């Protein structure tokens, strides 16, 4: 090797040595600008608060949400373009597994993750409760079932609803008559959805209830019991959620009204010791029944609500509410239609007037149908011919229809305890015991009026004007209703005139609400759905009436 070649080889060796030294130095002391912090071992705890964030990103003591920062930075924390080519593998969604579980320990052994805090607080008002809590309610209706997953925080004496997750499926439990196991399995999509939305460490202390409506009764008592038993066994064997006392059952109509009242007053902030406004009344119009719940206020200290099935004393968050409640079975919208049709049919047969024989059918003028409408009576008495109801040929301004609806209320029926509403049922008068607080109308009340462009606040006089417009027929609709959907609904539903006039009669004659009293209707408050489910879930969190314990189990 020549001297020149030896010199070149020595230079290469020196450069390699210097490179090795530089790499070793950097790895030992860290990159410029970084602290001399050893990497944590597998036994060290990692704390979010140890992460150094840019100045101004959070205030002292503020909980940092790394995924959803409250304030946007002037410049992104990371470059939008990767420094090096990155291949990302996106995992596909897999079904939620249902672990088989067996009880092993007491509820006191449950621990909750402190990393799952609320935006409102990091420590619960009551140390025995977690900051965040979940409640699951399955509403098993006749046509389908739906699950509500409610997320609460316990930052204050009363739980605060933070978020609601919702999913609906069809058909309902009653469609599985003769197949109880199939009925139970039909709820799996809802239960798996709940598993996805409740963090794993909270599932065993997240109570669940399955409440079927009266539609399940139509399958027969033994069939309904078999379905409910199978649903309960499925929950106990395949899911971690604790079941509340009487948690898998048919919901009584009276409790539907109570829970709906709790829901609306909770969302309006009129419940609890810090409430600054009086509670509101709630009227719920379903298909088979209608419920009324309100808190009467008597002028004299010596007066109070008389004892009876209508009286319900509610304990909520240390406050006691003495409520009037009643569920009028058979006076829901669909049942009221049948009742009014029966009145019209019987009246026509008795008088033999307005009867026209049209081949194999009998035509009867029906004052509760809009102008020139026709409707085949679904319960025609004669097997030889069907009954066709037809609307009047001249506008009648709804008065005749309301007269029939008022007769269906049996206002003059004997009433043992006065004052009374209708059909012999006791009820304190609104004009004496509930003079100025709001009245909320929900369910079919909302559906029938809002879809026609009615504002959310109105009077019975406004309802009468709307009913007159609807009953006047298609020629008048073009000028009265500008909404395309409203016109479509009116054309497809000949009983809309009947529905509105029945509602007017129910409110003004049945419940005796003054025509100029302001009424409110809504489907949601603060983007939370109205109805009985939220109220029932709040009841499940009540210390006095919870009827459940944490379901502390382990996988086997």
Swiss-Prot record:
CDD domains: ASKHA_NBD_GDA1. It is a single-pass type II membrane protein. Residues 1-12 are cytoplasmic. Its EC number is 3.6.1.42. It holds the Pfam family GDA1_CD39. Its cofactor is Ca(2+); Mn(2+). Gene3D superfamilies: 3.30.420.40, Exopolyphosphatase. Domain 2. One of its GO terms (molecular function) is ribonucleoside triphosphate phosphatase activity. The chain crosses the membrane at residues 13-33. InterPro entries: GDA1_CD39_NTPase. One of its GO terms (cellular component) is Golgi membrane. The active site is at residue 256. Pathway: Protein modification; protein glycosylation. Coiled coil: none annotated. It catalyses: GDP + H2O = GMP + phosphate + H(+). Residues 34-556 are lumenal. One of its GO terms (biological process) is protein N-linked glycosylation. Keywords: Calcium, Glycoprotein, Golgi apparatus, Hydrolase, Manganese, Membrane, Metal-binding, Signal-anchor, Transmembrane, Transmembrane helix. Glycans are attached at residue 372. It is found in: Golgi apparatus membrane. Belongs to the GDA1/CD39 NTPase family. After transfer of sugars to endogenous macromolecular acceptors, the enzyme converts nucleoside diphosphates to nucleoside monophosphates which in turn exit the Golgi lumen in a coupled antiporter reaction, allowing entry of additional nucleotide sugar from the cytosol. This is Guanosine-diphosphatase. The lineage of its organism: Eukaryota, Fungi, Dikarya, Ascomycota, Taphrinomycotina.
